């Protein structure tokens, strides 16, 4: 794993950037300041989408290989999105309480374009991207669902099932998934096929 990193402190907007090389060595690159209060920062290619869930304000920017952050655009979306999941240049927005979803695309110029709106089941605690596919998980029931988001922002449900309850982290690694429980340290692995 190698690439640039952005560290953000929401209380005062301080940022620091760094780089991890192919050997895992970290190098500090730059320091700066952004607006405070961002609740979500989502990477989309080299661009970043900043989101405030209390008022829906967004900003987009680009992190250069030199660690310098450049602001690209500002805008506004609906407030209250609990999860924002990137899939290529597209984004899936999800509200846990209503199941409302919206999809959009972030251009390389930082412009956000809404693509589609819809509704899914409520209560998903984790939404994990794997290529164009998504794994939805409810930690209280173990319920899962999988689906696909196309480049036009259209979501298609693929399958439903169940896993164990209580997984607190689900990490994608290619087509494989690592499941982790913070209370017990238990792990499990799985694979999502393309069907």
Protein language model annotation of sequence segments:
Residues 1-195:
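Trp/Gly-enriched beta-strand/coil motifs that build multi-repeat beta-propeller-like domains
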């Amino acid at each position: 794993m190698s690439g640039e990193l952005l560290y953000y402190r929401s209380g005062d907007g301080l940022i620091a950037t760094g780089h991890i090389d192919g050997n895992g060595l970290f190098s500090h690159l730059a320091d700066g300041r952004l607006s405070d209060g961002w609740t979500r920062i989502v990477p989309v290619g080299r661009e970043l989408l900043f989101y405030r869930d209390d008022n829906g304000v967004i900003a987009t920017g680009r992190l250069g290989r030199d660690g310098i952050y450049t602001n690209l655009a500002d805008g506004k979306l609906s407030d209250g999105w609990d999860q924002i999941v990137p899939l290529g240049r597209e984004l899936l927005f999800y509200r846990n309480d209503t199941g409302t979803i919206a999809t959009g695309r972030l251009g390389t110029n930082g412009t956000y374009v809404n693509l589609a709106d819809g509704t899914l089941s409520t209560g998903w605690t984790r939404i994990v991207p794997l290529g164009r596919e998504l794994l939805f998980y409810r930690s209280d029931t173990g319920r899962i669902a999988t689906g696909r988001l196309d480049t036009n922002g259209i979501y298609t449900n693929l399958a439903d099932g169940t896993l164990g309850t209580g997984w607190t982290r689900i990490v994608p690694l290619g087509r494989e998934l690592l499941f982790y429980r913070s209370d017990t340290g238990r792990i499990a692995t799985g694979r999502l096929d393309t069907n």
